[in-house]
Amino acid sequence: MNKRLIVYILGWVLIVEGAAMQIATVTSFIYGEHEGLYFLGVGALSALLGLLAVKVKKPKNPVLYQKAGFAATALSWILMSFVGCFPFWLSGEIPSFIDAFYETVSGFTTTGSTILTDVEALSHGMLMWRSFLHWLGGMGVIVFLLAIIPRLGGQQNIFLMKAESPGPIVGKAVPKMRNYAMMLYGIYFGLTTLEFIFLIVGKMPVFDALNISFATAGTGGFGVTNAGIASYSNYLQTVIAIFMMLFGINFSVYILILAKKFKQAFRIQELWVYFGIIVLSTALIAFNIRSLYPSAYDAVHQSFFYVSSIITTTGFGLTDVNNWPEFSKTVIMIITFIGAMAGSTGGGFKVSRVILLFKETRKEFSLLIHPRNVKTVKMDGKAIDHNVMRSTSIFLVLYIGIFALSWLVLSLDQTDFVTNFTAVAANINNTGPGLGMVGPVGNYSEFSILSKIILIFDMLAGRLELFPLMLLFAPSAWKKS
């Protein structure tokens, strides 16, 4: 394992995080808040330690293979979360270190579950940092490093990209990893800016528009008011719902569109299944909740917003869905598990994995009836490699195992069945809100320290697609090979 290069990457992570904190520093000073000093101090120390690591551990061989690439990515996310929580904790705005760490992990992993009971009690700088965590974590800091550091951007470091990119397959839309990373961040920044403009046109306050744009782009879901998105107009809610849906699309689709390869972009099967799930879920829920709202338009508006929010794992809410019929809540839980498209900023199991498992199951049934037939699983007209199918199956088993163990530990808190189940589902899928005590108007403050630690693990595991984080606990991974 190239430990020297891992330390070098961690150093750059600290530098990037230290620089990112200065956005919160500037915000605090604009509003005349002394909390900016915490961001200034922690950010400066982070950057200093990062520079030291980069200078001392400059690698001779800038190549990471799969094991080291996964380890570097997992350690980067843990380190980012650890350093990122200090302003919350040192300022006293979140007095408990575990709570501050939980909130930061929730931000970076774009989960959006919170331990805060009064969001509006936070200073402007803290709110900005909380939302910007989503934007940093949405596309991923490792992808950012691949874009800005030439020595890391070679095709040989594809394992860094694979470790941080959501989904079973990392496409090769462009030949050079650095170019690919730069294109991803260019599209990411462009869509974020476009949403910000639409929100400003709708007369949303600039501070709110920045925070909501960051949270939507990262599909995170942190808001700046206790009322959440419900405090804004129908126009603003619709803009947010549309952009949540757009950020749940595989960014390779946007790359193909920009390259004017429209036929190739719109032939992607996962895209149409994703849209199909949104349309079907919206229609089913709207019909089911029609009697709760004064008009069909209101029912469709509420349904589309929440479906867009949950399938993309953003987690914004307009109302307390605990009051919705059981059928609607069941649909919500199903799309919580499905999640967004692979290669998007969304979380969940991913639409592509659902398609692959469905096709593999159909193939096995076909073989039972026609044993001599030779069939291969195909996606978009291309045969799927056996290793991808094997990885998808292993992912499912590991996912179920982590989910079951987490659910078992949370049951020790004596909270109700629905709350425990949906809390684990919402955190491992990086969605944020669940049902019961952790619904859209609830929070995670009542859980024990042990349960919060388990949920922190779930958030990190879910965002990193399980394997990179689990690798850290394998002793053989740290032995020389």
Regions found by a protein language model. Give the residues of each.
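Membrane-proximal intracellular helices of multi-pass ion channels
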Residues: M1-S481
